[in-house]
Design a protein with these regions (language model features):
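Active-site core of glycosidic bond-cleaving carbohydrate-active enzymes
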Residues: 1-66, 72-77
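Carbohydrate-active enzyme catalytic cores, enriched for enzymes
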Residues: 15, 47-134
Length: 134
């Protein structure tokens, strides 16, 4: 089920099993959340036995996957009281880059990832970049 997959993958990221968690998350997104006709990830409520979409397709019932992008691939952890934004990137090897724009406090923070660096612009928080340890 989507919830079981999310909790399993999230647990792997939290236990710093980055390579395995990243590869399995990509696999799950491709096989469960990617719509080949629309060419985008989707978050359906469920699938029918014939693999047609079932239920609510508009409220992103299964949108917990966004945390796998933000906390998993992007490696984001933040604390407003401590004024910190910690980044431990683990985005997929198959991707050339990834970019996020996040509302933090009163500004939009831009974070761009590639395999050589992470560039953070306009963060109101102190940025702490860490390397993942596989």
């Amino acid at each position: 089920t989507p919830d079981t997959a999310y909790f399993t993958l999230d647990g792997m990221f939290k236990q710093q099993l980055y390579e395995t968690a990243t590869n399995l998350t990509v696999n799950h997104i491709i096989n469960y959340n990617y719509h080949s006709e629309w060419k985008i990830p989707i978050a359906p409520e469920a699938y029918r036995r014939d693999l047609k979409l079932f239920g609510d397709q508009y409220s992103n019932f299964n949108a917990g996957k966004i945390l796998l992008y933000l906390e998993g691939f992007a490696g984001l952890d933040y604390s407003i009281p401590d004024d910190n934004l910690t980044i431990i990137p683990s985005f997929p090897d198959e991707w050339d880059w990834m970019e996020l724009r996040l509302p933090i406090k009163n500004s939009w923070t831009r974070i761009r990832y590639n395999h050589d660096e992470v560039v953070v612009e306009n963060s109101p928080l102190r940025v702490i970049k860490k390397q993942r340890i596989d």
